[in-house]
Amino acid sequence: MVTNLQKELIAIETIKVLYQQIKELRETVNPKRLGKYSDTFFDSLSEDWFDGINLSSWMRGLNTSLGQSFFENVAHILCNGTKKEFTAKKKSLLQLSQSQKLRIANIITDLSNGNFYPDSLADNDEISEALEALEEATGFTADVFFEDDDHVVCIELKTVKPNKGVFKVEKQKILEAKEALRRSYPKKKVKFFIGFPFDPLSIEPTGFDKQRFMKYSVGFDKYFAESEFLLAAELWDYLSGTKQTMETILEIINSIATVDFIENFDFLQQKENATDKKSEYINLLSKWFLLREIILVENRESIRSKTSSNKRIVRVFNQDVFIIKREDDKYKVEYNEERNAILSSFV
């Protein structure tokens, strides 16, 4: 199951994205003119709020970089993974034989000409036969990378409407990456997926149809088998190892992304509310899944009594829950993890 700490970390990512997007849009444009974005996301800027939001609406309401960052961070939280680069810049290029590169290129040609079907197992069996002197493999970055005792898993997160022609390039890159990873992790099974956060064609927020989705993206079924990509709920369940993870993510988003989001955020930033309006403060923290912060509020008097003679700790106690910065006309919001860690040691 998704743990309480994971829920809190996902909630923090949601808060960061919402605050940044809303503050910037309020300063630059009239929300009612944003027809190209989803109503459900941007109604949080107006008086009308649509009860219930899905990841399709959430993603369309974010700019590309902000949305990509959100999904990557949530993925890392769920699987305890990281983003990992195997690139020349990072001096972490893997190795591959020239014959393997040639065989992969031939497979791509056969796929392009319709002479070969995208069966990942057949691809891997054929390529792995090649053994000879090694050279540097093509660099790549895994948006999600995690390793356990038996497996190495890489996932590349994509937008749900990739550009035409991208799948040929992606297939070749993934085939090369899998073979190079096998050489680096010879005792482990290597898996490499493309991941799509949601199915834009599904009526249900967490629903998906892989065959329909493959037809929706031009050229997808020419290069990839169903087993080579993870879609919507399938992706999130795979990352967490538990069912109904996508429902949990949506529950968190819906609890936070309301019409009074900015007012709620400001309420939590006002430290005196933790004392003067303690019950209301704790209720909002609970609604926003900020469970570690609840522990601090409930133990506020005890912490103060233990630290009253320590000016440094008193100053930490008086810091904001969230740190707000503005860099290059962009808002950056971070949960004050250092404050929480220091104060939690006195609970």
Enumerate the language-model features and the residues they cover.
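A short acidic (Asp/Glu
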Residues: 74, 100, 158, 166-168, ...
